């Protein structure tokens, strides 16, 4: 998996365990018992996707006296070849148990990572072979997912060493692409201007470049002139009494007996300030970081004889005895004096940008079409919704009308008017419609029966 490592972070992890600190760097206080007010130095993130696992393994191994002793006596080849990893068989049971648990946690983390990755790319019901997928992670042994063995330590060290060693090359490539993009945008901007405006923009650019080149002489990193300038201006000491050993001790910030990459890069600050000022429009801070990296690489190439990315006192003192240490009259050539790319590389880069832009435009067009289709679908749904609401309203109105028609009439004051119940009584015919009826056919109203009266004597 790709890694991105912040500047200066890769090799700060495990002094005084010097050899393994070529892979990591965990600042450790050499003084015997730690005081409560001594705060542990925060470990910088290497940028590796397995940084936490790597750090925790180192922290656990550091607690074992036997392994720590063997590590201090080992050289870089013993570590890289895997010879030191065999000492894992002799660490305490408690340490092995902690390492086993760390590995199980790492395997579990990778499984979840892989599952999320596969779910994003494939069908959810697809069966995933986690064993095969774990093989793409080279910092652990996928054949044994439960215990931490010598092979795990060997793979962890080798993978971290390789990944961190690739940091500088990746940084240079990133800077090249940055410079090509900057030039591409500059040319496109000039093409968009009229002739007079273009001439003015080109004149302004040339003026900025001229101001950027006008700076004091930059000393060669690691040279006598450069170190003496730090000695005088940063350390405030007499340049005529420059002492390389004292200089080394002063700038070994964590007193671990070596100058790591951050400690070396701190020595270049005065030189970089001669060329780059964040307040100046013509000074690019990305170029300054590239310059810092070039300076560090130059020192490492000439001073770090065993290529463990750490400068020991012996290596530093030996470098001050070389002829090149004092012969630096020409000074250091800054990054703008070396083209970061060729015209052919720029052409390929612009073709890549054009292809990517065309792809993005096509994708944007598809999204626009899909958005329009969704809009039309939404309009249809809204129309159907309005029709449905209108139909419901009409039904409610009809229902209300039917209820009003079936209700009894009401008096003017709003009260309902009810008729008296006439029973079986005949309804008189309207006047004028009555006909003469024979007396024999006329109904005589029935009289109630007459009861005989009883004399009071009979009671």
UniProtKB/Swiss-Prot annotation:
Keyword match S-adenosyl-L-methionine: no
Effect seen on changing residue 316 to A: Decreased binding to GNAI3 and impaired GNAI3 activation
GO annotations of cellular component type: early endosome; endoplasmic reticulum-Golgi intermediate compartment; extracellular region; extracellular space; extrinsic component of Golgi membrane; Golgi cisterna membrane; Golgi-associated vesicle; lumenal side of Golgi membrane
GO molecular function: calcium ion binding; DNA binding; G-protein alpha-subunit binding; guanyl-nucleotide exchange factor activity
GO biological process: regulation of protein targeting; small GTPase-mediated signal transduction
Binding site for Ca(2+) 1: 252, 254, 256, 263
Main location: Golgi
Keyword Repeat in annotation: yes
Positions contributing to Ca(2+) 2 binding: 304, 306, 308, 315
Compositional bias per record (Basic and acidic residues), positions renumbered to this chain: 192-209, 433-445
Disulfide bonds listed in the record: none
Domain notes: The EF-hand domains are unfolded in the absence of Ca(2+) and fold upon Ca(2+) addition. The GBA (G-alpha binding and activating) motif mediates binding to the alpha subunits of guanine nucleotide-binding proteins (G proteins).
UniProt-recorded name of the protein: Nucleobindin-1
Species name: Rattus norvegicus (Rat)
């Amino acid at each position: 998996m790709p890694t991105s490592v912040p500047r200066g972070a890769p090799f700060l992890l495990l002094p005084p365990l010097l050899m393994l600190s070529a892979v990591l760097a965990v600042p450790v206080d050499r003084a015997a018992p730690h005081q409560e007010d001594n705060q542990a130095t925060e470990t910088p993130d290497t940028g590796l996707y397995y940084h936490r696992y790597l750090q925790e393994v180192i922290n656990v191994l550091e607690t074992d006296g036997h392994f720590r002793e063997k590590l201090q006596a080992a050289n870089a080849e013993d570590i890289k070849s895997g010879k030191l990893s065999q000492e894992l068989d002799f660490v305490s049971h408690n340490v092995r148990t902690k390492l086993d648990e760390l590995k199980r946690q790492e395997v579990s983390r990778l499984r979840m990572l892989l599952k999320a990755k596969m779910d994003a790319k494939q069908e959810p019901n697809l069966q995933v072979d986690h064993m095969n997928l774990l093989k793409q992670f080279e910092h652990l042994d996928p054949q044994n997912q439960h215990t931490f063995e010598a092979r795990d330590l060997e793979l962890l060290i080798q993978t971290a060493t390789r990944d961190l060693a690739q940091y500088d090359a990746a940084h240079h490539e990133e800077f090249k692409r940055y410079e090509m993009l900057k030039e591409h945008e500059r040319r496109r901007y000039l093409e968009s201007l009229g002739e007079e405006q273009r001439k003015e923009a080109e004149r302004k650019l040339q003026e900025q470049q001229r101001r950027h080149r006008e700076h004091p002489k930059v000393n060669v990193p690691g040279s006598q002139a450069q170190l003496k300038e730090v000695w005088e201006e940063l350390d405030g000491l007499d340049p005529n009494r420059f002492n390389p050993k004292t200089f080394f001790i002063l700038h070994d910030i964590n007193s671990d007996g070596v100058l790591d990459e951050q400690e070396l890069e701190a020595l270049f600050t005065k030189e970089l300030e001669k060329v780059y000022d964040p307040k100046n429009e013509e000074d690019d801070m990305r170029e300054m970081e590239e310059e810092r990296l070039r300076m560090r690489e130059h020192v490492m190439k000439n001073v770090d004889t065993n290529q463990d990315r750490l400068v020991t006192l012996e290596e530093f003192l030996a470098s001050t005895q070389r002829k090149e240490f004092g012969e630096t009259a020409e000074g250091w050539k800054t990054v703008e004096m070396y083209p970061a790319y060729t015209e052919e590389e720029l052409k390929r880069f612009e073709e890549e940008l054009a292809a990517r832009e065309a792809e993005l435009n096509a994708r944007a067009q598809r999204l626009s079409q899909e958005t329009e289709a969704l809009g039309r679908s939404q309009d249809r749904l809204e129309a159907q919704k309005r029709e449905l609401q209108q139909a419901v309203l009409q039904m409610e109105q009809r229902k209300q009308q039917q209820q009003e028609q079936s209700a009894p009439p009401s008096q003017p004051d709003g009260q309902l008017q009810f008729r008296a119940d006439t029973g079986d009584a005949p309804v008189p015919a309207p006047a004028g419609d009555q006909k003469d009826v024979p007396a024999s056919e006329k109904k005589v109203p029935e009289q109630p029966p007459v009861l005989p009266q009883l004399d009071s004597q009979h009671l």
